[in-house]
C-alpha cells in the first residue's frame, strides 16, 4: 500500500480590493503656472508605505501615500497628494516572508495605479502628464532596513525625487 501525504498548501497572495482613500490636486496660481513658466519645474516626490493588519484573518491593508510637488523659481506650480490602498489576503506565508511581501510585493502591485492617477491629475490640471519613474521597492526597503536596523513592521518613508 502506498502512503499518501496530504498536499502542502501553496502560498497565496490575493488582492481583495483596491481603492483611492484620498486625492488632492492643488494649482495655486494657474494663470502664471500654465502660461508664464519658461523653464522646467523641479519635481519632488515623497512616498510612504503604511501597513495595517485587519481584523479578518490574514488580511492586510497596504497604503501608498504619495506627495508630488512641482516648483519653479521657489514658487509652487502644483501639488498632488494621493493615498491609494489595497486589501491583501496572505495565506500559507511565513511571518518573515509576510514582511517582504507587504512592504515590497504589495506596493509593486498598486504602484502603477498611483502612477496613473498622478499622470491623469496633472494632465487634467492643465499640465503635461507627469510620469513618475518606476520605484524599486525591494532596494529601498533593503536600504531602509539597513539604516533602521530592521523595525518590527516596516513603515518607511521614501524620498524618490526626480529632477525634471
Swiss-Prot record:
Localization terms from the record: Cytoplasm
The UniProt function text for this chain reads: One of the proteins required for the normal export of preproteins out of the cell cytoplasm. It is a molecular chaperone that binds to a subset of precursor proteins, maintaining them in a translocation-competent state. It also specifically binds to its receptor SecA.
Q: Which organism is it from?
A: Orientia tsutsugamushi (strain Ikeda) (Rickettsia tsutsugamushi)
Q: Which family does it belong to?
A: Belongs to the SecB family.
Subunit field text: Homotetramer, a dimer of dimers. One homotetramer interacts with 1 SecA dimer.
Question: According to its UniProt record, what is one Pfam family this protein matches?
Answer: SecB
Judging by the UniProt lineage, the source's domain of life is Bacteria
Encoded by which gene?
A: secB
Looking up PANTHER family in the UniProt record yields: PROTEIN-EXPORT PROTEIN SECB, PTHR36918
**Name of protein:** Protein-export protein SecB
A GO MF label: unfolded protein binding
Where does the protein principally reside? cytoplasm
Keyword annotations from UniProtKB, A to Z: Chaperone, Cytoplasm, Protein transport, Translocation, Transport
As given in the record, the signal peptide range reads: none
- Name the Gene Ontology biological process terms: protein folding; protein tetramerization; protein transport
Gene3D superfamilies (alphabetical) = SecB-like (3.10.420.10)
Q: Can you quote a single GO CC term? A: cytoplasm
